[in-house]
Amino acid sequence: MVPEPGPVNSSTPAWGPGPPPAPGGSGWVAAALCVVIVLTAAANSLLIALICTQPALRNTSNFFLVSLFTSDLMVGLVVMPPAMLNALYGRWVLARGLCLLWTAFDVMCCSASILNLCLISLDRYLLILSPLRYKLRMTAPRALALILGAWSLAALASFLPLLLGWHELGKARTSAPGQCRLLASLPYVLVASGVTFFLPSGAICFTYCRILLAARKQAVQVASLTTGTATAGQALETLQVPRTPRPGMESADSRRLTTKHSRKALKASLTLGILLSMFFVTWLPFFVASIAQAVCDCISPGLFDVLTWLGYCNSTMNPIIYPLFMRDFKRALGRFVPCVHCPPEHRASPASPSMWTSHSGARPGLSLQQVLPLPLPPNSDSDSASGGTSGLQLTAQLLLPGEATRDPPPPTRAPTVVNFFVTDSVEPEIRQHPLGSPMN
């Protein structure tokens, strides 16, 4: 985070003589800031412990979440407490040597949080847009390399310019006694803001908009599938030859399935809208004010402190918003914390996708399972019911994201299921049986 370009001409602020003054803020301000600090530290610590202790959550996708929660935890433990003292006392009350160090950690932790949000959006983008290639592209070493790159960029944008004095270029202002408001020139503010906010936020908008378009396209494709001549159930469509069609049931089930996918597309739109709104509401005012302050010096210290804490609150909301839309996090939290309600687990195919599940496997939006049982014996019960050997039975399963499917009618013979969307599935064993011979 870029500190406020306050009225100082050195990275070492001036302190007035005597003991620190009494807090100038009211009691409710101190209480509110303490609640924000405790909630930030507790929520991020809980989710880090949850991922580390639950085997179901230890996967490549959650590497980025651990990095995000770590940066937000550092904001709550290292950045917020001195900032609270600064806001309450109106001056820097800690050791003067800690001012520059605290400012550097402020920039690094907040920048790392924003860059980790960008990595999470990239991970979701690859998972939804290229689910079959996700495991090949997003391996554990590549994920760790991306995380290391994000933290390195955040450190370079914070410690290096401050230690070398690049933030003071072109500035000549009188110092304010007792203040720890770092001098920042317009070039430094523009470069730091562009690298740590505007470029990552553009990438976040691009990836989430592509995900939203993919969700809507999937809903349209499913709706077009339900308008075919085949009988579409709510989650199971069975084509059997011969079979008597029932047009009334076709149209009703098709409308029901289309409506459900339309609702899911709308829910995905609202989810992305909430995430993007929270991100820009918390951080955009701060960076706009930073640029305005560097240009015209027209932002009061009180208003800048409010905008700074608004950006800090993004680290409080991240551990609440992101797991809120992840079902596996809810179930793991229910097992980890007994008082938390654990939603029931749905039986879903490993190929079923969800933007907000943290599994790293490839899971496309539509799972089609082809079931090809061999011809049944002439004296089987199915022949007497259908009037002859049924020959070929095709089962196409439309699996909605994150939902359980209805159990199909029990087959007369156990079919061989081939899932074409699971890359590491075992090859099925094919055996030949002559027509009319019994199968084991």
From Swiss-Prot:
It is a multi-pass membrane protein. The chain crosses the membrane at residues 28-52, 63-88, 97-122, 143-167, 186-209, 269-295, 302-325. Glycans are attached at N9. InterPro entries: 5HT6_rcpt, GPCR_Rhodpsn, GPCR_Rhodpsn_7TM. One of its GO terms (cellular component) is cilium. It comes from the Eukaryota. GO terms for molecular function: G protein-coupled serotonin receptor activity; serotonin receptor activity. Its main location: membrane. Specificity for G(s) G alpha proteins is determined by the length of transmembrane regions 5 and 6 (TM5 and TM6). Interacts with CDK5. Interacts with MTOR. Interacts with RPTOR and NF1. Belongs to the G-protein coupled receptor 1 family. This is 5-hydroxytryptamine receptor 6. It comes from Mus musculus (Mouse).
